[in-house]
Amino acid sequence: MSDENHNSDVQDIPSPELSVDSNSNENELMNNSSADDGIEFDAPEEEREAEREEENEEQHELEDVNDEEEEDKEEKGEENGEVINTEEEEEEEHQQKGGNDDDDDDNEEEEEEEEDDDDDDDDDDDDEEEEEEEEEEGNDNSSVGSDSAAEDGEDEEDKKDKTKDKEVELRRETLEKEQKDVDEAIKKITREENDNTHFPTNMENVNYDLLQKQVKYIMDSNMLNLPQFQHLPQEEKMSAILAMLNSNSDTALSVPPHDSTISTTASASATSGARSNDQRKPPLSDAQRRMRFPRADLSKPITEEEHDRYAAYLHGENKITEMHNIPPKSRLFIGNLPLKNVSKEDLFRIFSPYGHIMQINIKNAFGFIQFDNPQSVRDAIECESQEMNFGKKLILEVSSSNARPQFDHGDHGTNSSSTFISSAKRPFQTESGDMYNDDNGAGYKKSRRHTVSCNIFVKRTADRTYAIEVFNRFRDGTGLETDMIFLKPRMELGKLINDAAYNGVWGVVLVNKTHNVDVQTFYKGSQGETKFDEYISISADDAVAIFNNIKNNRNNSRPTDYRAMSHQQNIYGAPPLPVPNGPAVGPPPQTNYYQGYSMPPPQQQQQQPYGNYGMPPPSHDQGYGSQPPIPMNQSYGRYQTSIPPPPPQQQIPQGYGRYQAGPPPQPPSQTPMDQQQLLSAIQNLPPNVVSNLLSMAQQQQQQPHAQQQLVGLIQSMQGQAPQQQQQQLGGYSSMNSSSPPPMSTNYNGQNISAKPSAPPMSHQPPPPQQQQQQQQQQQQQQQQPAGNNVQSLLDSLAKLQK
């Protein structure tokens, strides 16, 4: 049994033919045995039982052998799938046949038992012979099975060798492919490293101390954690880090001589926004190292980080006042700016890397930037003087002005922070030498070669948005060259208006805080004198219509019959103006110069208050540019002037309106002033002065010189001479149109003599006869009783106190 088991471990499953033969032999033996048993009926029962036991043992041994063979086949089938499939089919067939043999054996055993029960007389000799035959047959079968198993083992070994060879070849192919992929990846990596980095691979020249300082400086600055830095592109991050390291002398990069070419190319690739076309980057200057941020590229849109800094600047600009302690030489002058398309945002992007900007002013073709220290101004001049901005090189200088800048409140658009806006196109090179000074008397650039048609003055209390709207309406509605000036405390409105009329400006517009405008238009009289018309508290559209009418009349280039114009229907649907008595040709001095503008007749204006100017309504025979019958405290903003009125009896051409003083007065009429005139004279006096006048009038009502004392007190409060006041109380004084227009202005408590509004003309002094008449007038007026005037004054004061 041991030999059979050993052979069964090595050999394969026997072929189906052999198994069938063995089963057939067993069946034959069983048949023979059954036949012999049938013959020998006399055999004892013990022998039969022994035979049965031996047969059962043989069957069990065969089953064990078959089981071992099946296990061997399963193990071999795992190594070779194809062989396993064929062997499994053979095993199934063998098991089916074996099952059939077992069934046959069982049937035979049952038959034998029946035969044994029937035939008890079988012989022992027959049993021994059968056993010998069975042993011989079993030996034959075992020898045949061992031979077939050896053959199957050799076939399986050959198959194993073939499969191993195939596996080795597959492994070799996969290893070769992997090696090729690795080589290609290494080549790509080395190629990318060579393209991107050209730094020297010699690590012996690395300054580890400097590297540690740089790393520590970057980590201590907390720059990497800032959200503004994290949103930057990779190139801008590198440039920002380099700029920060170079700003400190301890962490600045030092380039060895033999590595300068490589390092400069690397830094040039990191700072792609640099404008240098040279391959070699020059060493950084101290000003460049002090830059807080990389230089902006105006060809690209504003970044988020720049937008945040500009928003912070606008927020802080509103809080800056003139009381700040601004160091000297911290104001940068910028010249050669384009006339258009320059904004505060552009200048902020260019100059903010050099220091903290407090304020930006943009004028016409130049501007100013206020830093908080003079070093920032010097750095900006050093770095930006050679750079191209707006397609040209800017003129950068330290501003020579020592005055504090005028700070604007709010950003109202391009150039809104300046004091001057113009629609005229004036080249940068043809301006006067003082055009850069933003602190001159007028606060705007004065050109000696060019005069505009209209000047717009904006009060400090006026709305800038409305002022810009008025400017746009004049520019688009009239087509005239217009300048708009934002008034400042140092500006004298009267001087500005006087200069405008003297320079030939057609008219001026004053923008009020009540969203309306006041207009004064200038024109030449028949003898070359300058006259003016005044319109108070009108809309911007009406002001545009006035200037359009002036434009049309000037384009016609012919004398205008203003009396005839008053008969025509007004273009705005107003009724025709009344025609006063007098000649119908030429510009009479007593007529209103409305030029088709829809103004109510003078009779209607007498019943209306005269606005903020403190002037009495004109009479029916008095032109709009004529003087009032008595001197008034006329307020045009802060501008005040006092001018004697013309005589009503004599038609003399008007001079410079209320800006022109008259010649020696003519003999006045003896008509006393009425109550309305006295009320107009004292309506602007302070309350304490009114009380003093009332008490003095009550005490000195019976004295003959009461009027003179009261008039003297009024003169002292109005800043006029007593002699001039007495002449005005007595009547109208004449004006000489040929005399130059002297003017007495009172602005901020200072008496300033304005320049003449028209070119001076030759004139003769008044004859002695007129001087004698003047002296007689003064004496008669001093001797005149003051009862009626004092009583009227008392009534007027009583009304004012009510």
UniProtKB/Swiss-Prot annotation:
Main location as per UniProt: nucleus
Region of interest (Disordered), ranges: 1-174, 252-293, 571-675, 717-802
CDD domains: RRM_Nab3p (cd12342)
Biased composition (Basic and acidic residues): 159-174, 277-293
Keyword Nucleus: yes
Domain RRM: 330-401
Transmembrane residue ranges: none
Protein name (database record): Nuclear polyadenylated RNA-binding protein 3
UniProt gene name: NAB3
